[in-house]
Amino acid sequence: MPLRPGRCYRKFSGPAYTRREYIPGIPMPKITKFVMGNVNGDYDYELRLITTEKGQIRHNALEAARVIALKYLSKKLASEQNFALVVTKYPHHVIRENKMMAFAGADRLQDGMRLSFGKPIGTAARLEKLGELVMYVRVKKEHLEAAKEALKIASSKLPIRTKIEISALNKEAAAQ
């Protein structure tokens, strides 16, 4: 069955569904790497991708944002030693779907909304507060514009609105 659009899972209501020991058949999240680049480097600026609304981000959207940001930064900065990219959210919440048949005569084969709890189809990261950090990039001053563009492209892959905040990491960068 094809994947539903992100708008189907953007909003949330009720408590998180996270108790994996009681949930059989949870698919593994697509996102596996959360830290990329040279984390121990000496950088001037930190750019943060911050949410401006509450919502959920599915694991495949997080992975798409990570991949596109990493690809753009690697291409523009020529090496993964020139930046540090960290995804801070993990998809804990298990998403369920009550699969419905959509063909002639399906009403005789299925029960509709009776026993409609649903089966696990994926995971999502819940962002329950405004201003939560999704990912950040650390770069030197000369790579600031490329990092801004990378986060802007990555934010287009996410189902909720975000903004980019820039902060200086050392005193020389703050003075300029």
Swiss-Prot record:
It comes from the Archaea. Gene3D superfamilies: Ribosomal protein L10e/L16. Keywords: Ribonucleoprotein, Ribosomal protein. GO terms for cellular component: ribonucleoprotein complex; ribosome. InterPro entries: Ribosomal_uL16, Ribosomal_uL16_arc, Ribosomal_uL16_CS_euk_arc, Ribosomal_uL16_dom, Ribosomal_uL16_euk_arch, Ribosomal_uL16_sf. This is Large ribosomal subunit protein uL16. The keyword GTP-binding does not apply.
